[in-house]
């Protein structure tokens, strides 16, 4: 009896020690839960509409994975037609967007971090003073000419635009937000997409609108 009790006690101590030495595993960063809310708060003011800067639409997972383009949506002096690049409509999947000239901002390029990671790092390394006048060399407004560097052109961009990291012309991400996004990018920027499911109230409202518009 004593031997059994002693054996049980030793086993309990060993198990307790092993559990105590087990490293805590941080929960995986979720695009839907952790990343999209940051992009919505800090990025979509410039990167959400059809005419978003560099056509980089960060209002949805589809836009983030589509990437950026050097071709502006609106060109007043254009004399020939250009194929539209409407998200959700004119291409499906990353490869179709790559065929239309879009390049990734989420994928690492060999030993180089993702373009988004480097843009955020550039902005984080040169923070702006809150509630202060913007530096003269940061040009904003309707006549601003957006520069849309591809991943291989980032070093030249950073050299000529040292104060124009992302987010542009604002105080930027908090340290926690910056750490979360950079960790997600370093881990491969996996995007978990969740289908939008309307609530019962929203579904009823949609049905009401459809009935109204179909009369």
Regions inferred by a protein language model and the residue ranges of each:
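Aromatic- and Gly/Pro-enriched helix-to-coil junctions and flexible linker segments
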Residues: 19-215
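Bacterial N-terminal signal peptides
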Residues: 4-17
